[in-house]
Amino acid sequence: MSLWVDKYRPSSLARLDYHKEQAAQLRNLVQCGDFPHLLVYGPSGAGKKTRIMCILRELYGIGVEKLRIEHQTITTPSKKKIEISTIASNYHLEVNPSDAGNSDRVVIQEMLKTVAQSQQLETSSQRDFKVVLLTEVDKLTKDAQHALRRTMEKYMSTCRLILCCNSTSKVIPPIRSRCLAVRVPAPSIEDICSVLSTVCRKEGLALPSTLARRLAEKSCRNLRKALLMCEACRVQQYPFTEDQEIPETDWEVYLRETANAIVSQQTPQRLLEVRGRLYELLTHCIPPEIIMKGLLSELLHNCDGQLKGEVAQMAAYYEHRLQLGSKAIYHLEAFVAKFMALYKKFMEDGLEGMMF
């Protein structure tokens, strides 16, 4: 049994539920013959990967859906061996080079070299190039991005790249200038409500419009999250009711409790407890950027107007440090410690003002 988010994922550009004008433009791009490198970007849950797979289906036909998982071992110049998992068909290869950490440059060079030098076995597709899909390009090191730029030029005749990321701000200009940028905006609340209603109708379920809207708003316009929450509601209670509780993910509840612990007490002992909770989130593969963003959102609820600006500025500083560093826990803990000091001083100053 597959999840709704996979079961009802559109497989062609013609069947996409929203951004249909963009889908028509992508279809024209595929049919024109001169297919460029693509840089597909947009927020999480907007449908980037779905559109990329639809493009591949338009390029090569149904063969791209015959996927296999491959494990490759790449040896770095320092003789270090790196295990990389890829998803491949006869026509394309999908890889996340940032999984290799600081060795991502070697992974990119080896992967692209291997794909570009292999010939197509099936000529029925009438495409003389293969496609390499690189995900989370914005997390690549600068060395890897420069290596990617050189490799793009070298193997242009036999290989096309589709780069996928959340934001182009961390992608170097030479790569951006060599790709056709395709922005996939987050779906509107109405779009998400429409998709939820359609999926529930196909499942034979009656979804109240009020609940559909609550799901769409709670998902922050993330369609994948909305579908997962809707399916969780179905497991929790059916028939649906307009005011039924929408289940939250465990890590979101845990993060809210962590924020409440920070606000309730500002001591070294509490900081040590919070550090342990942050470690717990990181070991469960919650990205540090998501932790920082969620923590900031929860903490701002307990700040007044004057303090909000300082806390937001402080979070931006430590988020930047987070991107530059390699140990996320240091920067998350530093943000919490700085917030504790700022919040404690703010509360003490407020009490003094009330007394006098």
Swiss-Prot record:
N6-acetyllysine, modified sites: 20
Q: Which domain of life is it from?
A: Eukaryota
Which GO MF term does the entry hold, naming one? DNA binding
Cellular component GO terms held in the UniProt record = Ctf18 RFC-like complex; DNA replication factor C complex
| Keyword Acetylation included in the entry's annotation | yes
Location in the cell reads:
Nucleus
Modification sites for Phosphoserine: 125
Q: Which GO terms describe its biological process?
A: DNA-templated DNA replication; positive regulation of DNA-directed DNA polymerase activity
Q: Which UniProt keywords apply?
A: Acetylation, DNA replication, DNA-binding, Nucleus, Phosphoprotein
Its annotated function is as follows: Subunit of the replication factor C (RFC) complex which acts during elongation of primed DNA templates by DNA polymerases delta and epsilon, and is necessary for ATP-dependent loading of proliferating cell nuclear antigen (PCNA) onto primed DNA.
Q: Cite the PANTHER family for this sequence.
A: REPLICATION FACTOR C / DNA POLYMERASE III GAMMA-TAU SUBUNIT (PTHR11669), REPLICATION FACTOR C SUBUNIT 3 (PTHR11669:SF1)
Oligomeric state and partners?
Answer: Subunit of the RFC complex, an heteropentameric complex consisting of a large subunit RFC1 and four small subunits RFC2, RFC3, RFC4 and RFC5; the RFC complex interacts with PCNA. Forms an heterotetrameric complex with RFC2, RFC4 and RFC5; this complex has ATPase activity but is not stimulated by PCNA. The heterotetramer of subunits RFC2, RFC3, RFC4 and RFC5 interacts with RAD17. Interacts with CNTD1; this interaction facilitates crossover formation.
Could you say which protein family the record assigns here?
Answer: Belongs to the activator 1 small subunits family.
Q: This protein is called what?
A: Replication factor C subunit 3
- Organism listed in the record: Mus musculus
